[in-house]
């Protein structure tokens, strides 16, 4: 009888086929028919059923037939879900049946998002389906996905990306507020504006940082024009951003550090006016803690100026400051609990090219940091005598951003991949660099993604 020799894209991928929402797919099986017969002597069925059927005994949802053709050409209209698909080839005369069963996964359009704009200032988002960080990823770039889902519309004056699974909303913050999308479909929320996110009227529209912390009681924090707003989702009736300053006077830096270990607090911010750390607890309340020890988190040397703040290992917050002559130092502190624990105060002046550093990020699985000049990235293990050259970009390229891949559900690569965005004229490029999560040293493995415009931000969406 007929023999299904292969289904390209399926049998060569471990009998699994992964496609995207709204994608048009085509599967062309290689079938060897019984001698003396042709395709006309057979009937073909593409039979699909869910891997986790919903319902109760005798009332489970039923399977469906996608097509009754030799090849499958199908427009995905379903939401993300895991199915089984069986390709059946039946001899019309003898009834003999041959079949091939495989996993049929409809995946959300997730991956490494790149926000860019062209020379005219028209912005869009592109999703890198990197094979290492996306199940079923094949390295393709799903381009212009905002305009594809919004009638060709482009974004203007975009700044950075944010995500709130609680709503669920995907945000692209801009000079004028935000583009607010359904986090699954990437379609704009109708008649919803940046102002609608707040329970107060803003004096100035100036989004500077946003972070959703899905721990404890699910807190969303936003900095607008150096003022801190939050939503404590577990508090009854609290669904919009409110100013949580109370009586505190401060000027918040454009950074929010999540705390992803158990404790009293969910986020850390920094007051540039009074040189002190601020915390947001799991209920959405703002505090200005103090401490003893190596340094007082509520009174950092007033001669120092804020440079950068980010998440470190085991819930630590790492802060870089500079003095009047430009010398850099780093403050490490654990602010997870109501009683802060200063960890270390480190001088960075001895590190190679540190005076030319323009970008920073910290390890979340090891005690090290990356810092970048315009063309080179260094890795430094805390307390080490010197830093190691980690990565250099191509000739004529300028590093414009670097971000760590952080995904707690990925036990293999979480905190082990650095994405680096570069610019050469109006052409943007993204490098993916895998490194040792304990030492911060490069594995020597890197990959390039090209075809972008002027890159404004990068963000991982699962």
Regions found by a protein language model. Name each.
Residues 1-144, 410-415, 422-462:
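Acidic/polar, low-complexity intrinsically disordered N-terminal segments immediately downstream
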Residues 142-153, 159, 164-365, 379-389, ...:
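Preference for solvent-exposed, low-hydrophobicity sequence contexts
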Residues 155-162, 168, 210, 399-407, ...:
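Signature of short aromatic-glycine-proline-rich micro-motifs recurring in repeat-based ectodomains
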Residues 318-319, 418-422:
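Charge-dense, extended regions
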Residues 344-358, 387-411, 439-457:
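Conserved blade-ending motifs and adjacent loop-strand segments that build the rim/top face
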